[in-house]
Amino acid sequence: MDLSRHAHRKDEHLSLAEKFYTPTATSQFDQLRFVHQSLPEISLTDVDFSTQLGPLSLKVPLMIEAMTGGSPRTGVVNAQLGRIAAATGMAVASGSQSIALKDEQAIPTFTSLRENNPDGLVFANIGAGHDVRAAKHAVQMLAANALEIHVNTAQELVMPEGDRDFHWLDHIGNIVAALDVPVIVKEVGFGMAQETLQKLQHVGVKLVDLGGRGGTNFVDIENFRRHQKELNYLDTWGQSTVESLFEARQQPDLQVIATGGIRQPLDAAKALALGARVVGSAGQILHSLIKTDEATTTAMLLDWQVGLRTIMTLLGTTDLTQLRQQRLLLSPELINYCQQRQLTY
């Protein structure tokens, strides 16, 4: 693809992600309820929500998920995200670096993320069709602490100029074996089923980002870019974030990041209770950044951290291990899903 067209597509994605943003997500967190504890017997200051993701220690179990890069406009956004990550103590993931692997002129639009967050956790990001050499280059480009490999079959098939060949597992296994940083395999809004998770485990994957349905919808975005816009029947394709979390509970050796439709601290708390080590948000953060400014978005994410501590205090849980022991009440729809999929709930 012509590189200027690739950069234009990145700008399109940014604009369309905001166009299709909805304040109410369809990730199904509203179909889960905690049981209130009137006597928690802890104080707010007792709560320690630090977490571990593979060898990485995170003081905050929230992260800024992969969004963008590849054009001057998106380079500015990445600089803002880097500063927000530094101010909030949150990990941050780059958008796909594919364009920067082909065109050196695009590299600064990604390195602005690290330049503005020199001491924080930064995750590189490439597609699953790339080889080990590309993976190492992406990590080196950002001095990254981990690499995300995104699997985005649904997006590619709807994208007019997208890939049509999806022999990815060998690439993923080779990269996991060759890299000296953790490798996270990431969906981009369509969720993961236990069959997928089993395949990933078989090639050595230990960390996954479930990327469930409910947040940014790349079928909607790519279909909008088609002349006929004829693939709208796929706009509900995939497993929700909550369904994906139940799928992942069948694979206890995998460590999970939950993303997809995280709109508030209560969503994050529910995801952590279902087993996620870290919870990520992209669309909500991008929406705040576009509609307000960097300072307001930073304040929002600091408020989320206070909110998560508040919820954990309400439940009488001082750490994430205790939070994961909380039983959640499920809607009939979720119970039905788990029963049909033979998932423990």
From Swiss-Prot:
The keyword Magnesium applies. CDD domains: IDI-2_FMN. GO terms for biological process: isoprenoid biosynthetic process. It catalyses: isopentenyl diphosphate = dimethylallyl diphosphate. SMART domains: IMPDH. FMN binds at A66, M67, T68, S96, N125, K186, T216, G261, I262, R263, A282, G283. It is found in: Cytoplasm. Keywords: Cytoplasm, Flavoprotein, FMN, Isomerase, Isoprene biosynthesis, Magnesium, Metal-binding, NADP. Its cofactor is FMN; NADPH; Mg(2+). Substrate binds at R9, K10, Q155. Signal peptide: none annotated. GO terms for molecular function: FMN binding; isopentenyl-diphosphate delta-isomerase activity; magnesium ion binding; NADPH binding; oxidoreductase activity. Gene3D superfamilies: Aldolase class I. One of its GO terms (cellular component) is cytoplasm. Pfam families: FMN_dh. Homooctamer. Dimer of tetramers. Belongs to the IPP isomerase type 2 family. This is Isopentenyl-diphosphate delta-isomerase. It comes from Levilactobacillus brevis (strain ATCC 367 / BCRC 12310 / CIP 105137 / JCM 1170 / LMG 11437 / NCIMB 947 / NCTC 947). The gene is fni.
